[in-house]
Amino acid sequence: MPRYLAIVAYNGAPFRGWAKQPGYHTVQGQIEQNLALIYQTPINIYGSGRTDKGVHAINQTFHVDLPDKLPLKQLIAKLNQLNYPDIFVKALVPVAPRFHARFAVKTKVYEYLINTRAFNPAQYHTVWQYNHPLDLAQLEADTTLFLGRKDFWSFSTASQKDTQRTISKIIVQQDHTGTVKLTFFGNGFLRNQIRMMVASLVALNNRTLMRETVQQLFDQPQKGGCKVKAPACGLYLKTVLYE
């Protein structure tokens, strides 16, 4: 069967994360269920990585092997009708038979949104309602603590052996609504890594955490060493880039 790379957006609020789990409503589970409904046979999809409960995606990717029965435009239309309103398939692109959506990743880009003004109930599931001002200059200066290749074990709840990751760039921006956007570019991220980094940056900003403490978490890495974690609602998988 031909292999395709899919690009998909989703609202993470109603789901128990990306990865299918028995008894839970997940993004992967819903897409596979609807593909099986369309083709009348089980079909597995393989994502570029997992997102946790409540985390959103603008351009998540997965690969899938599909029977050559439906035109792609018709398939996308059927999927989007079945997945409405929380999942939207943007594209299906033919790829090589051995292409793998996870192992071929070169760079992942995540965004994190923080509301620094008054509480906004309309954004409760989409933006961290921090509701206090942030010093952008300090925020930008503190991002340097996380740049480069480091052992991020302290900033994760991951059990995996390889906890070395490279963060090539972190961009700090604020728009006219007071929403601060942190954009992270890396070769991959551990579970909860970005949420722990964001919470650490905010704690550094309000002086409840010292730079020396953050450096110690890198010098003496230990699972879950970082004790702060930003809410899932503000995190978005923005882009997955391949070789």
From Swiss-Prot:
Catalytic reactions of this protein: uridine(38/39/40) in tRNA = pseudouridine(38/39/40) in tRNA
Top-rank EC class of the record's enzyme: isomerase
Positions annotated as active site in the UniProt record: D52
Keyword tRNA processing in record: yes
EC number: 5.4.99.12
Amino acids binding substrate: Y110
InterPro entries per UniProt: PsdUridine_synth_cat_dom_sf, PsdUridine_synth_TruA, PsdUridine_synth_TruA_a/b_dom, PsdUridine_synth_TruA_C, TruA/RsuA/RluB/E/F_N
Keyword tags: Isomerase, tRNA processing
GO MF annotation list: RNA binding; tRNA pseudouridine(38-40) synthase activity
GO process annotations (BP): tRNA pseudouridine synthesis
Domain of life: Bacteria
Classification via CDD domains: PseudoU_synth_EcTruA
Family, per entry: Belongs to the tRNA pseudouridine synthase TruA family.
Subunit relationships: Homodimer.
Function: Formation of pseudouridine at positions 38, 39 and 40 in the anticodon stem and loop of transfer RNAs.
Name of this chain's protein: tRNA pseudouridine synthase A
Gene transcribed to yield this protein: truA
